Amino acid sequence: MAELISFVVPTQSDKVLLVWDLSTGPPAEALSHSLFTVFSQFGLLYSVRVFPNAAVARPGFYAIIKFYSSRDAQRAQKACDGKPLFQTSPVKVRLGTRHKALQHQAFALNSSRCQELANYYFGFSGWSKRIIKLQELSGLEDAALAVPMQKGSPQFLCAVEVVLPPYGCRSPGVGISEEPLRQLEEGQSSFLMKRKTAQKLAFQAAVSDAFQKLTIVVLESGRIAVEYRPTAEDLDARSEEELQNLIQVSCSSWSQSSQREEECLSDFSLEEEDLKLCDPH
């Protein structure tokens, strides 16, 4: 049976491993590194988190490891359970258990995580992304009312397209971001920094949005396929000019973007050729 992998934070119990009976010698950071080295051999990991045992238990640590693929998690569990791995005593490895009645909201992966997942399954040359439109929204309302525009918080809208040539697939995405400009942060340099940050965040949100419409299909043979599920607005956006319809709809749902996984700017790098579209004249 084929496995479907979406570009969301993995929460299903069959993708989560619980590892315990970890020794007390190494610190938690060293244990996390060792666990990552061992378990990443079975597939791409979302996270490795190490915790100290409860006070009522004997000294030691346990870990929670999240895979993107349930198949990878099951293979890792069978291969590592009861083995010493990187320590002298064996560890216990179990698949996570969770009551079926519990429902957890699926949070979209941030752009860095989306690209990491795409690189793993499609290869670095198996996909690409491009900016279709980058528009500054700050002051547009004042301009429409013929009111002199004041320098406020920079707000940008970005439309991108993720392209997968081997699969003949294109997925559009839209993101909006605003960087609040406080009164104490006056001056041209502060405004330009906020403006550049807003551009980056809008780009990140657009890339993540494009990946949300894609699902990785891992066949039993190990081959990879892609499922594309466009929204109704995407079906109307057949050309770059028609993307205005998609942009207008996305503006109305901007408030929903706060529910997505937060992304740190330190994990993101925007190529200079992308920024050429953003530089103020």
From Swiss-Prot:
One of its GO terms (cellular component) is PML body. Residues 90-133 are annotated as: Necessary for nuclear and nucleolar localization. Its main location: nucleus. It comes from the Eukaryota. GO terms for molecular function: DNA binding; RNA binding. It is found in: Nucleus; Cytoplasm; Nucleus, Nucleolus; Nucleus, Cajal body. Signal peptide: none annotated. InterPro entries: Nucleotide-bd_a/b_plait_sf, RBD_domain_sf, RDM1, RDM1_RRM, RRM_dom. Residues 15-98 form the RRM domain. Residues 1-92 are annotated as: Necessary for nuclear localization and for nucleolar accumulation in response to heat shock. Keywords: Cytoplasm, DNA-binding, Nucleus, RNA-binding. PROSITE patterns: RRM (PS50102). May confer resistance to the antitumor agent cisplatin. Binds to DNA and RNA. C-terminal half contains cytoplasmic retention domains as well as determinants involved in its stress-induced nucleolar accumulation. This is RAD52 motif-containing protein 1. The gene is Rdm1.
